[in-house]
Every structure is written in C-alpha cells, then in structure tokens.
Amino acid sequence: MFLLYEYDIFWAFLIISSLIPILVFFISGFLAPSSKGPEKLSSYESGIEPIGDAWLQFRIRYYMFALVFVVFDVETVFLYPWAMSFDVLGVSVFVEALIFVLILIVGLVYAWRKGALEWS
C-alpha cells in the first residue's frame, strides 16, 4: 500500500532546499548597490591596470578541445568504480560498460571527422 504521508519529510526537504537559493538570490538583488562605479567597469589583472586591450578573443578550437576533454574526463569518472568492482558485478554490467565506451568512441570519431581535433 502506497502511503503519501510517508514522503512528507522528503517533500518538505525538497521545498525548503529549493526556496533557500531562490530567497538568497532575491535578497542579494535587493541589498546590492544599484550603481556600478568606474572601478567595477574596468578590467583587473593581478592588481595592475592592464596595458592595451584586456579583452582577447579565444579561438573556437580551444573550446572544442576542452569539450572533448570534459567528455572523456566524465567517462573516466564513470568507468573507475565499474573497474574497481568488476569481479562482483558480472557479465551484464560488462556489456553495459562496453556499450557506454562504444557510444563514446562513436562520439570521438564524429568529432574527428568534423575536424574538431585539427588545430590548423
């Protein structure tokens, strides 16, 4: 039998944990100064006023490499616990991990074919 009142603590926790960040966001908006001085609008590099233009545009290649790195970094995070408990989990989990790795390899091949890994 499913009793809804058994989950009252969960719903209270969910509502409170959702309201606290929203309240903090709105309170900081009301208490923050509305006008920004010239110091807030100037660039700041290690305590020294920058010489020349401080805004540099990065090439999109940096972002592509960073994106591929993040994908494979997350893969490592998911595969490490699986590798540590491989002998306990069995063959079905091995097949699931193999499918996961194959999907990532397909993504790598796609990025490679699109030229995301070429620097020139």
Curated annotation (Swiss-Prot):
Group of enzyme by EC: translocase
Catalyzed reactions: a plastoquinone + NADH + (n+1) H(+)(in) = a plastoquinol + NAD(+) + n H(+)(out); a plastoquinone + NADPH + (n+1) H(+)(in) = a plastoquinol + NADP(+) + n H(+)(out)
Q: Report how it sits in the membrane.
A: Multi-pass membrane protein
Protein localization? Plastid, Chloroplast thylakoid membrane
Task: Give the family from UniProt.
Answer: Belongs to the complex I subunit 3 family.
Partners and quaternary state?
NDH is composed of at least 16 different subunits, 5 of which are encoded in the nucleus.
Q: Which HAMAP family does this one have?
A: NDH1_NuoA (MF_01394)
Please give the name of this protein. NAD(P)H-quinone oxidoreductase subunit 3, chloroplastic
Q: Write down the species.
A: Guizotia abyssinica (Niger)
Q: What is the lineage of its organism?
A: Eukaryota, Viridiplantae, Streptophyta, Embryophyta, Tracheophyta
